[in-house]
């Protein structure tokens, strides 16, 4: 039995942070992919939040951008509060 993995709001948020970091350093998706050993399609999926970033991959990304892992989660509490408010209003 295979489990379908769905992206969470946190995955989407972390992916958006990845995109911000990548663009701020001027790297293309392809260049970043080469540096961390994945395809550019995988970077696209990370940035959209459709694929989760595992701990070891997150560590590799931190090395590329010279940031601590917490950088990817800065502001997530506020983002989640907005998402919760939005979903309870539906």
Map each language-model feature to its residues.
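Short, basic-rich loop-to-helix N-cap that marks the start of a DNA-contacting helix
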Residues: 50-63
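Short C-terminal boundary/hinge segments that cap the last helix of small helical domains
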Residues: 66-83
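A short, Lys/Arg-rich alpha-helix, primarily the initiator
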Residues: 2-24
């Amino acid at each position: 039995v295979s489990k379908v993995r769905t992206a969470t709001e946190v995955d989407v948020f972390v992916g958006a942070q990845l995109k911000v970091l990548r663009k701020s350093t001027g790297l293309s998706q392809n260049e970043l992919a080469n540096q961390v050993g994945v395809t550019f399609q995988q970077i696209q999926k990370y940035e959209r939040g459709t694929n989760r970033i595992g701990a070891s991959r997150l560590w590799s990304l931190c090395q590329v951008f010279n940031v601590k892992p917490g950088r990817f989660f800065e502001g997530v509490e506020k983002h989640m509060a907005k998402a919760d408010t939005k979903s309870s209003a539906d």
